[in-house]
């Protein structure tokens, strides 16, 4: 008896010391009072093989006993905190652990396992074949060999154990002295501990057995088992699939005398308790900032508005109300549902795996847009991820930027309407469905929409749905075999050549917009194109063509081409281009059959894309919604259209057309009816086109069927009202930077009589300008003169001449363009230019030049001979050698039928001296002609001739040349004598040659 008392006192001291230590460490611990007077024991196992507990026995004088005990089930491997077990972590400090593979647990831990090898410091452990136990710790394991520090022993056949001993065995039948008992057949136990085993049917609160005189024993224990059916306690509970339960809240049970033992629950972000739910056990917990209290509710909320999730697996239905921050992995298991209610911010910075359902909901009528951020390692969806907050008063911001983004389920975001929600995401792999409503999507997850490498692109083998004005801006490469469905939205491709394998399907009205950055080698398949749903290029379109055989529509912009496989059955003559606005910049819309898109929904350009169209290629189709062409001066901004009738329409619109018959003629007119609502409550505009000839009618009323005209006889218009209309001309403007095509729209002239007035027109000529830097081609566009009579007036024209300019640096070709003279008679000859080629030679060599001069104006019907030039080649020789030059002179003006130009005579002279012989050429002007057929011209220059002089001395013979001036030739006879003299000189030269 004395020994038992000593053992009891030792156990009591150890318990009190443990309580003091726990109280100092877990400063936020609180206590929950209990009326039970018992020790606290928890012990269970799925197979009822081992039960462990560090229990002290009480007597009549026992006052305080602390027992920090927890128990886990067959699949539990580790727990973080002194609450229920988990299957994913290892814990220290007041933690119970039980698993088939548990090897080590430290500090105040109860352990049970078939392979437990080592446990230290106040650990209760049990097994069927314990061989040696020492100190106040019970140990069990099939191979347990040694445990130190006050341990009591138990075995499979123990029937009675006394003192501070905990016992557990598969066949345990009787345990005495404040010991908790559990076995495979346990049916009923009471006390402040939750307990369960494989066949447990009912367990309630604080389980322990104590002597009749025991006064106070308290303990808080969490317990789990593989087949728990019903458990209630102020403790979190988990089953075989539990991954973790943690919280900084403390749970405690105290006796009437004030003794308590608390098991704080803590995590790294100490604030909230959360449990992973099993079928019928507690599925959600309500927690406060500092303490966790167990309730059997189905929601988890926080008093300060923030819920911190630890590593959690959700296996049932769980609702989290308020802001949620998860810094560890969260898994929504298949068949489970996690509802995030009324939070304005959600952050998942670790893995988020949705195999069941994750719902973002609002219960209030008004609320701000949600900020939802996923930035962990993996975002994996095989179930459903759904967010519904279309009534948000500010923009919803969703950011999906994990390292790996994989969706094979369904992600659906219906975001704020008042200001389009924004979605940013990193490259993804999608084999399921993305559905977006009221959203602006920026792929690439970077601001500024920077292009990504091809290896960093997305893969879409599923569907992407764009509805209610959603715009998907694609910067990163997208490959795969998926589809993008434009229900009522826009798809904006910055790099169309990297958008491969995808099919764009128009299921409503919207816009497929393409930046002219790169030619797409393969046509983009487009299904459902009608013209109401449009294709736009965000730069000037210089050409548009359609191949009826292949069904490919090709738009050309400069040297780039963008092709779309829209299918066969279209008429190439019915395509046109209209200018408008998309994403805050000018765009050119590819229209078909005069139909203009009506629902390219607009949005603020700061956050996404806006679309509207103005201008036209034919007669100016009218405007509806935020996409249309101007007519009657109508203009579109956002979703407001106006016409010259002063009517205006706001909001989304539908297009109606009407044909008016009057005065034996049929005309289609353009009208806008303001604030007209159809049977479905939609505001609409009735629009058609009017030609520039301005057919007129009086519109008295409009309804859903069209516009109506009041007439006196039912067929004739009672009153006419002229409307403004517009013509559009395409002008190509060229400068040093290249050529750009612009569209000029002018107002048609007012009708002043029955005669149709000719509209203004433009004349375009191409001019090639050359300078030292090269040649550039420019296009000059001028307005044609207004018609003043029925006589056709020739418009201004330009004459272009090519001039080759040569200097010492070489020859360059220039083009000179001048304005032709105005027409003053029926036929007016324009100015012309005469071009002569001149070869100029100097000491540096010869250069060819071209001289262009203007022809004289005509003064009569007689053709005037233009000025001409005579070119002769002159070889100049001196001591340095001979150079050939070309002399060009202007021919005399013609005063009679024939005018003989001046001529030149050239003679070759060989000069010899002591240094040798040099050949020179002397050119002189020929004598005047004195015959009747020639007009005497200016006196010719003096003519020189050369003769040979032979000198002989003792050194040999030398040849010298003496040059003499001869009188002017007065007849052809003199010229003959000169010729003979030159012949003689040549002969003497031959005779003088040394033999």
Curated annotation (Swiss-Prot):
Q: Which residues form the signal peptide?
A: 1-23
- InterPro entries named in the record: Hyphal-reg_cell_wall_N (IPR021031), MCPsignal_dom (IPR004089), T_SNARE_dom (IPR000727)
Q: Which UniProt keywords apply?
A: Glycoprotein, Secreted, Signal
Q: Which GO terms describe its cellular component?
A: cell periphery; chromatin; extracellular region; fungal-type cell wall; membrane; PTW/PP1 phosphatase complex
Could you tell me the superkingdom of the organism this chain comes from?
Eukaryota
What is the species listed in this Swiss-Prot or TrEMBL entry? Saccharomyces cerevisiae (strain ATCC 204508 / S288c)
Start and end residues of each stretch annotated as Disordered: 98-276
The entry assigns this protein to a family as follows: Belongs to the SRP1/TIP1 family.
Q: Does the entry feature the keyword Signal, yes or no?
A: yes
Q: Which Pfam families does this one have?
A: Hyphal_reg_CWP
**Full protein name:** Secreted protein CSS1
Free-text disruption phenotype from the record: Decreases haze protective activity in white wine.
Residue intervals of the Methyl-accepting transducer domain: 26-253
Listed GO molecular functions?
protein phosphatase 1 binding
What is the primary gene name for this protein?
Answer: CSS1
- What upregulates this protein? Expression is induced in both high and low pH environments.
- Subcellular localization, as worded in the UniProt entry: Secreted
Any idea what job this protein has? Secreted protein that may be involved in cell wall organization and biosynthesis.
Per the UniProt entry, the glycosylated residues are 28, 35, 468, 664
The lineage, from the top, is:
Eukaryota, Fungi, Dikarya, Ascomycota, Saccharomycotina
Q: Which PANTHER family match?
A: SERINE/THREONINE-PROTEIN PHOSPHATASE 1 REGULATORY SUBUNIT 10-RELATED, SERINE_THREONINE-PROTEIN PHOSPHATASE 1 REGULATORY SUBUNIT 10
**Listed GO biological process terms:** membrane fusion; signal transduction; vesicle-mediated transport
PROSITE patterns named in the record: CHEMOTAXIS_TRANSDUC_2
Q: Does the keyword Ligase apply?
A: no
């Amino acid at each position: 008896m004395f020994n038992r008392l000593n053992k009891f006192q030792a156990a009591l001291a150890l318990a009190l010391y443990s309580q003091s230590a726990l109280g100092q460490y877990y400063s936020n611990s609180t206590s929950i009072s209990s009326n039970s007077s018992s020790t606290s024991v928890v012990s269970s196992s799925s197979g009822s093989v081992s039960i462990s507990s560090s229990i002290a026995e009480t007597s009549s004088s026992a006052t305080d006993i602390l027992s920090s005990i927890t128990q886990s089930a067959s699949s539990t491997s580790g727990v973080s905190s002194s609450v229920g077990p988990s299957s994913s972590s290892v814990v220290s400090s007041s933690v119970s652990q039980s698993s088939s593979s548990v090897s080590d647990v430290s500090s105040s831990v109860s352990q049970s396992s078939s392979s437990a090898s080592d446990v230290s410091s106040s650990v209760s452990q049990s097994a069927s074949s314990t061989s040696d136990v020492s100190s106040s710790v019970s140990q069990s394991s099939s191979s347990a060999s040694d445990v130190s520090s006050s341990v009591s022993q138990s075995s499979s056949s123990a029937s009675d154990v006394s003192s501070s001993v905990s016992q557990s065995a598969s066949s345990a039948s009787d345990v005495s002295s404040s010991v908790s008992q559990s076995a495979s057949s346990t049916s009923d136990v009471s006390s402040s501990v939750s307990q369960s085993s494989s066949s447990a049917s009912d367990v309630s609160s604080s389980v322990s057995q104590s002597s009749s005189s025991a006064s106070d024993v308290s303990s808080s224990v969490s317990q789990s088992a593989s087949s728990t059916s019903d458990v209630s306690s102020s403790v979190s509970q988990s089953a075989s699939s539990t991954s973790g339960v943690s919280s900084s809240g403390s749970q405690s049970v105290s006796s009437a005398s004030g003794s308590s033992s608390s098991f704080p629950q803590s995590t790294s972000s100490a604030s909230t308790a959360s449990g992973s739910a099993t079928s019928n056990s507690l599925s959600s917990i309500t927690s406060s900032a500092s303490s966790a209290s167990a309730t059997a509710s189905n929601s988890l909320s926080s008093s300060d508005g923030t819920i911190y999730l630890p590593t959690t697996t959700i296996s049932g239905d769980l609702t989290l109300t308020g802001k949620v921050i998860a810094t560890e992995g969260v898994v929504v298991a298949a068949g489970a549902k996690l509802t995030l209610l009324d939070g304005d911010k959600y952050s998942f910075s670790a893995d988020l795996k949705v195999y069941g359902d994750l719902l973002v909901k609002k219960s209030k009528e008004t609320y701000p847009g949600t900020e939802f951020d996923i930035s962990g390692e993996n975002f994996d969806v095989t179930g459903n991820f759904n967010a519904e907050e279309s009534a948000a008063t500010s923009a919803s911001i969703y950011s999906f930027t994990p390292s790996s983004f994989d969706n094979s389920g369904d992600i659906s975001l219906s975001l704020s309407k008042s200001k389009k929600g924004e979605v940013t995401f990193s490259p993804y792999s999608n084999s399921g469905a993305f559905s977006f409503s009221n959203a602006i999507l920026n792929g690439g997850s970077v601001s500024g929409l920077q292009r990504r490498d091809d290896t960093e692109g997305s893969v879409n083998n599923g569907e992407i749905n764009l509805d209610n004005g959603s715009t998907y801006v694609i910067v990163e490469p997208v490959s795969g075999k998926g589809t993008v469905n434009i229900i009522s939205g826009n798809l904006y491709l910055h790099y169309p050549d990297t958008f491969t394998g995808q099919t764009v399907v128009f299921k409503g009205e919207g816009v497929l917009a393409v930046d002219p950055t790169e030619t797409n080698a393969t046509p983009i398949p487009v299904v459902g194109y009608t013209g109401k749903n449009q294709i736009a290029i965000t730069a000037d379109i210089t050409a548009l063509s359609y191949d009826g055989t292949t069904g490919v529509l090709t738009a050309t912009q400069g040297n780039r081409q963008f092709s779309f496989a829209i299918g066969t059955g279209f008429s190439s003559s019915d395509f046109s281009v209209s200018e408008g606005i998309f994403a805050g910049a000018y765009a050119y819309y590819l229209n078909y059959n005069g139909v203009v898109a009506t629902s390219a929904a607009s949005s603020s350009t700061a956050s996404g894309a806006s679309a509207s169209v103005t201008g036209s290629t034919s007669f100016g189709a009218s405007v509806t919604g935020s996409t249309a062409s101007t007519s009657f001066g109508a203009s579109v901004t956002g979703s407001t259209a106006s016409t010259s009738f002063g009517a205006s329409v706001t909001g989304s619109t539908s297009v109606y057309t009407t044909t008016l018959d009057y005065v034996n003629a049929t005309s289609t007119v353009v009208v806008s009816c303001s604030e007209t609502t159809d049977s479905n409550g939609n505001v609409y505009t009735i629009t058609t086109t009017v030609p520039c000839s301005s057919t007129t009618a009086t519109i008295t009323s409009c309804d859903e069927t069209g516009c109506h005209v009041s007439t006196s006889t039912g067929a004739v218009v009672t009153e006419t009202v002229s409307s403004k209309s517009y013509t559009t001309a395409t002008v190509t403007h060229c400068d040093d930077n290249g050529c750009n095509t612009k569209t000029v729209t002018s107002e048609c002239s007012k009708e002043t009589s029955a005669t149709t007035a000719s509209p203004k027109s433009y004349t375009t000529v191409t001019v090639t300008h050359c300078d030292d830097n090269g040649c550039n081609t420019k296009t000059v566009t001028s307005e044609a003169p207004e018609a003043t009579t029925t006589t056709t007036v020739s418009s201004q024209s330009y004459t272009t001449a090519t001039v080759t300019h040569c200097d010492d640096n070489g020859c360059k070709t220039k083009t000179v363009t001048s304005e032709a003279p105005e027409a003053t008679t029926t036929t007016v000859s324009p100015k012309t230019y005469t071009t002569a080629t001149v070869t100029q030679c100097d000491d540096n060599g010869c250069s060819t030049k071209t001289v262009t001069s203007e022809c004289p104006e005509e003064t009569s019907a007689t053709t005037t001979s233009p000025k001409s030039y005579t070119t002769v080649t002159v070889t100049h020789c001196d001591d340095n050698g001979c150079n050939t030059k070309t002399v060009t002179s202007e021919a005399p003006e013609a005063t009679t039928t024939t005018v003989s130009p001046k001529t030149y005579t050239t003679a070759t002279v060989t000069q010899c001296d002591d240094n040798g012989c040099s050949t020179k050429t002397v050119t002189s002007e020929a004598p005047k002609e004195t015959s009747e057929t020639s007009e005497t011209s200016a006196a010719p220059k003096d003519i020189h001739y050369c003769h040979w002089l032979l000198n002989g001395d003792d050194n040999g013979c030398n040849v010298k040349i003496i040059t003499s001036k001869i009188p002017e030739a007065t007849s052809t006879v003199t010229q003959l004598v000169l010729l003979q003299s030159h012949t003689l000189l040549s002969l003497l030269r031959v005779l003088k040659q040394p033999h």
